[in-house]
Amino acid sequence: MSAHPDDLFWQQILNMDPTELLSDDVISSTCDENTAAGTDIMQPLCVDMSVQPTTSGCHTGAMMSDSYFSNDTPDQNCQSHSTLTDLSPEDMNNQINVQPNQMTFQPISPPIQDQNYGYSNNMINPIKPASIIKLHGHSIGEMTVTDPSSHVNAQHFVQQSNPKFFLNMYPCMTANSQGPGECQSVHNQSSGSGSNSYDINTAPRDEWIFTTSGGESWVLKRNTPNPPNSRTNLIFNNAQPIFHTQPQVSGFSDCSYQGGGLNSREYVNLAGYTPVCNMQNIKNSWATQLGASIDCMTASPTGIDANVNSAFQPVGVVSNNRGANVSMGGMGNYIENNSPWNQYYKSEMANNSINVKESNVYGHVGCVNDAISDKQGGTANVPSSLLNPDHQDWMRMTGTNTHMLNNINTNTEMENYDFPENDGNVHGATGVDLSTLSNGQQHSAFEGNGTFPVVNTGNPRTTLNCAPQLFLLGGNPTIAHPMNGNNETPDKNVCKPTPSTGVIKKLNFDGVDRGGGIGNFPKLASFVAMREKMSNTVNPSCGTFLEQLEGLRQQNSFEKNISFADLHFSEEDDVLSSASSVSCNSNCDMKIEVSQQGITVSNLQQGFRQQMNMNSSVVKMDGSYKTQEMSNGCATDVTDNAGTIQQNKRIHSQNENPEDGQVREGGCSDVRNEPPRKSARIHNMKSEGVTCGMCMTAADSTRQDASGGSSSGTKNEYYDDESELTGLSDTDSDNEVQCCQEVTKVGPKTYSSENFNPEYRQAKRLLADIPYRRWIPDPVNMEDNDGPFIPIVTRPATVCMNGRRRRTFFRQCVTAFGPLSKLTYFKELLQSYVSKNNNSYLSISWPPKHGVYVMSEKKLGYEHIPTLKDKFPLPCGWMMVLGVVGAEPPAALNKNMVILLCENRWVLLHNYSNSTHELFLAASDLKQFMEEGLSRCDPIYEESTVPYGVAMENSLRDFLRNSRTFQDLMDQRDNMHGCNWTFNGMPGRLGDRVIHLCNPESVDSIPGDEAVVCEGRPLYFFAYVTTFKSNPATKATVLIAADKDLRIYGYHKGRPRIRYLCKNVKTFFKAGARKFYLDFQITPKRLLAVNEEEYLNTLQNAPCLLLKPSVFRNIYSQEGK
């Protein structure tokens, strides 16, 4: 058996010096096992293999046939592109440099006729599709057929005399031409029957002459050089589709396909702007990849093609968004499209049915605004959102083998781009002449017998013509949704950029030219591998890479050895080094192996070595297809009938609990016919023999724990009483997977939250702030700041608890407060709104499942406004009651917390429990209140319905249960000295991430008992807060202490600063140390150290707490953090 293609791929990459690998003049050659044998080029029946150079001067880098263009279209649109001045800002957006003199050949062998290939996820014997030649991201030639009888609309067919096919180009390589006449030789290093040498020469007029080992020459046209002296080099070509709707059009090949009324078409690459036509233009955005010279690196087998048995029937049109728009002929053809916005679809349409061999449709929609390469500076600026760990895996069908770099993805605010809500499909209807239909009729006509999805990024209201449409929406190139069915709304929040590092010397995250970042490809690969390990994502390519990486580290001794230790941040944040090693055994059980000494490469390999064996089978049905993906005991059935995808998860699983020896069973039923929600892609890790994570979530578990093990318990999932500290973890609401399994109580134990791996949850919370790591070591200058607001970097909302659901909460809040916020801000109008909407519930964005119950002063019996004006410094003008705070109905109202509106638009929270008055600045206006919620208000954290900001686990639960008295707390700090938990799940400072329990007697840098006194109360220190788990107490940001009444204080040693934080330990684990830096409580007049006007100005400029990621980066990047 031949070597594993992934092994060969990575071996060739790892055998190269990093500097050579990332140099501009690199000549890399990587091929899979299919090209190793060096077989002769297969020539199908009735196909004449020949290549002719481009004859038209306006074509840049595309090989065309001997056809001509009707209506003189090229003459009207052929224009040179020598400068950047002709480009509009939209055209320049999202473009990066690609070497102008590179030619890339893709490593795919031709299929064998009359033989169907099976697909296995390990890619030992992958299907062998046909090849095409791609020059600088463009189609080198066209594929046509010669049998007119194979077309549905045969009367439109005009046979060409000399059709072209490009098949079986052996090597996968990228070559740079230094000048005319220079010869370069690239060798195939794959295993097989020896190496083959291929010579590349530059001929006059910048043509390429490619000579195979058999002596056959291919003449290829090279791209025009990039415009000189430009910071961002651009080659801007537009792929212009030319449609022919007349019955008789001479000189063109007809590429209709069965099952759809597609008439003849041909794609031409034209320089300059795309002309205004009556058709939807196809925008060529191939330049949005991060370098073309690394195409071979990222071209591991990710898809397989359809096969045609004996008849050469056309199967449709496949296009990429870099200009490689090729009409698929009868032979199975493969279009390798390595663009950041990409999806493959290969199928055969014959006899009005679809025979699908592979549907690699995992590419979601997205836009990357800042992915712009600086050729001269050698830096690729990558948005930090590429590393969002919440979206590490997208919907996969039929066992797609997704390689490593494809697992870098982004979370994008798609609503900012007005992306159309469509299903992303184009469907074919038999015998329909699209030219006779209107736009809307064309789209509906595609819902026919036999579904043929293709890449579609146009609005369904545009002229689709059953062809790939690329369109700039919101000024950014986008691609369509994955094929999720006819009527489903796909997930728009994820895109799948595939960055390459061909000419890039450095990857700079967050899109700013800074010195930090990951310096070369192996570091990026190592990071992705670690992140995927922590997210429990099984990825064969990553596992192979880690094996090769470890082997290289042990075997090679040269100076520039690629080492796993090159990963910069893993050495500091030992959450990544002390967390559990994850593996997935044959029964799809999540196995946890905790290593106190840290994670090694061999530990990481285990998570990828034990992979789920997936088998795919394809069954022809009447006008539909059915693809089944099996993962041993856990199965996913994907059925598509007229474009509807139905997913049925996890039919059965059994596991044995090592503690009680009982076998637990749980069946899964079909719960929905919609695409899996994005969090469903993450397997929730469980230890102690818990069943597959797709069937049960943390929220399910904690609800069962709260109800005594019964899935039908009535106790609130956030409720904590004297006996239980239950599901108040930040991850409970983050997991959006619907419960698809009814838990059966077996023996004395049931599924509970203690079965979940806490270190995985903590690591998830820490990994969420990886894009913000440059701001984490944020120094706090206590010397210059003594007011209520110390300048710090606040934690973005996406990192806080319920961060992944915050968009949902915010949307609900905007909907609820919309009518109120649109009112003219007059007291009479506001009072009228309150009286008309009395007792109505207005959702707020934070905390989750809380809101404001609208209630008038008279209804509430509230008479404290004069008291507040007398005791507190408040702006002049009227004040009125909006309502009271309460949890999601049905719930008891907390009439002691009242929301007030001021004439200057302030939103205040008045808490008057226990005969004391506390006033908090909730927001500066209603708009800010919708975004911030009650995150600034201290009393809300004392409510039992507010979740903790720390991942709940057994040790933390025991600590909270046994710290209800002062003496218990002192005992716990001795017994649990050294315990630490992730602390960054609540609003507050970004750098406060881990809390450590400690005994001051064992730590020299922490003051002893009663050494510090606050307001006559001696303090007893029991914990400290750091940024990383590995930080000692000497690097603590805040020391945590308690008095004998269990009131919690924060203490900073630099300039001794003591701040009261909260009233007990449980509240501290919900509120954190935010009040130490940002205190939104309004100080009474009698305690003011400054005059009222100055204090009110300070409140007016109070910083926001829950920032959106885009706002966060905009604010702190400008400050140079």
UniProtKB/Swiss-Prot annotation:
Domain of life: Viruses
UniProt KW Glycoprotein keyword: yes
Biased composition (Polar residues): 701-715
Chain positions covered by the region annotation Disordered: 179-198, 649-684, 701-734
Entry annotated with the keyword Ribonucleoprotein: no
Glycosylation sites: 188, 325, 351, 449, 561, 615, 838, 911, 914, 980
Coiled-coil stretches: none
Keywords of the record: Glycoprotein
Similarity field: Belongs to the herpesviridae US22 family.
Name by which UniProt lists this protein: Uncharacterized protein U95
